[in-house]
From Swiss-Prot:
Classification via InterPro entries: ExoRNase_PH_dom1, ExoRNase_PH_dom2, ExoRNase_PH_dom2_sf, KH_dom, KH_dom_type_1, KH_dom_type_1_sf, NA-bd_OB-fold, PNPase
Species in which this protein is naturally found: Lysinibacillus sphaericus (strain C3-41)
The name this protein goes by in its record: Polyribonucleotide nucleotidyltransferase
Reaction(s) this enzyme catalyzes, per UniProt: RNA(n+1) + phosphate = RNA(n) + a ribonucleoside 5'-diphosphate
Major subcellular site: cytoplasm
Domain named KH: residues: 553-612
Transmembrane segments: none
Recorded GO CC terms: cytosol
Subcellular location: Cytoplasm
Amino acid sequence: MNEKKVYSYEWAGRPLVIEVGQLAKQANGAVLVRYGDTSVLSTATMSKSPKPLDFFPLTVNYEERLYAAGKIPGGFIKREGRPSEKAILASRLIDRPIRPMFPDGFRNEVQVISMVMSNDSDCTSEMAAMVGSSLALAISDIPFDGPIAGVQVGYIDGEFIVNPTVEQSNQSTIHLSVAGNKDAINMVEAGALEVPEEVMLEAIMFGHEEIKKIIAFQEQIVAEVGKEKKPVTLFEIDEAIQADIKAACETDMHDAIQTAEKHARDEAIQAVKDRIIASYEEQEADDDTMKQVYTILDKMVKDEVRRQITEDKIRPDGRKLDEIRPLSSETGLLQRTHGSGLFTRGQTQALSICTLGALGDVQIIDGLGVEESKRFMHHYNFPQFSVGETGPIRGPGRREIGHGALGERALEAVIPDESVFPYTIRCVSEVLESNGSTSQASICASTLAMMDAGVPLKAPVAGIAMGLIKKGEHYSILTDIQGMEDHLGDMDFKVAGTAKGVTALQMDIKIDGLSRNILEEALTQAKVGRMHILESMLATLAEPRKQLSEFAPKIVIVKINPDKIRDVIGPGGKQINKIIEETGVKIDTEQDGTIYISSANEEMNARAKQIIEDIVREAKVGEYYLSTVKRIEKFGAFCEIFPGKDGLLHISEIQEERTKQVEDVLKLGDQLLVKVIEIDKQGRVNLSRKVVLQEEKERAEQQK
């Protein structure tokens, strides 16, 4: 495979070119994917021996290089640092459909790395990287039950679009990424503008039809250049040990799992495990045997939970399959914050805080695409105490960033337009208790927090997590999954939306894929659950508060002639900085002449507005002004008609009589009523006091 081979395919009207055999030849598998002008190098490597772990050590990285967009990194070091939020989300996007495709018991470490080396914003680098990752694994000697593929789907004017361009994405009401193998879907990530469930389902199935075509293209390449898969040692259960353990504790484990309360259940299960482990330790079992014991006990819990759900239709906490845990919510918990909402669902609890800021507080995103700004931000934090544990305290990890982004996508659809509500909005969700579905609880809490803050949301949003237990052709769909069901189940399908439709979807599965029927049933069941949660939330706070918090910034909007913006800013920002220094406000200007003034002090807002209006105020012919004499010359006096604007009162226009010297009539600081009689081509204002005196004289005569 040292010879370079090139394969091409027309993908959504753009060329998809795969190059194999030239680059990164020491990796187990490597391909260069060119999609339009986007180029991604994807590699797959595997350790030579299994790792002594009880899980599959897979790492998937999507890495952006700024040279791909012709940019040099900012800062002092001038090289890429920690991955961007987009890169982290793309890594998760690729990881999720790939992970279920490896054999059970596989413990060799696998790394899949996709480097974006050239970026064309109209040709999705994430989907190119997904195809590249799949192909790198499929042509390698690494055990992999692929290929898989992914596509982006848009929806414009009733039509679905594959891999929409930037312009098309801006018009689309659906932003869907879907992945799977040739038989079924195994990953969904979507944001939408309150789209009905039926349309979302059709979008997913439309995407799967396109996926099948890309997989067929990959299979041709694998058939020609794929390596023979390397034999690897898979961890297998010792059936004799499993039978002994099952006989010793099957009944006790069954009873422990049916304990309703989470911590009590965990303790009961652990007590059964500890008894079995102690018995083997007394027999001085070797390390391999103990490894079998730990694995078999975990498998027993998993199998028993799944059996109870699919056969007995009983969940660990005693709920029905479609039953939601007890709900409660509260707003206005924190006095000095702009808005707060507490949402509790069983033993899952999220407290969200909403902060309002000026438009200048937007987040600037400077990645591979054009520089963008983000006016709404949703951040998710998951401290260790939420599960009653200790652990290292670090910054947000991939999971926290992913959950925050999911909440942001769900809520973004209902954020009011800037013209209606000219604020930057940040919501921070603090998970205080966790027993599953924390990301959806954070969506509910953030909705309440924004309503408490007075954000005029287009509609309230609620989220719910659905689960699946599948045994052969039989399956059970679970509403509002808890932690154990998430961990031991086959699917985590999160659905968020309003009463009108879906605003976000995310699906992770641990099996090969899902059929249309299961997806349709899960979406229908999720809608029923979502409506129930919305009803509970609205009972706490029916609509957004009419007044903002007294501690929130108040924003005043001033519309001026766009040509006058330079006058407000002044040379080198001198004028605008002077206003900010004098009033303590924040000022943001737009190119269309809109100026936003913000501070918590309404008096200072009004003062700043007056200063700006005075700066941009224009004199009009025929208008009268009470002016102040600022400078006297031989030919007349310069009078200030309003702050920042002077006009010339010529010596001949001071009075009806002839004036020999200006000083005979006027002195500095005199205030006199004048009329604008002319504004010349250069914008100079000419004033007259004589006309004012004549008009006063005429009115006096008419009154006689």
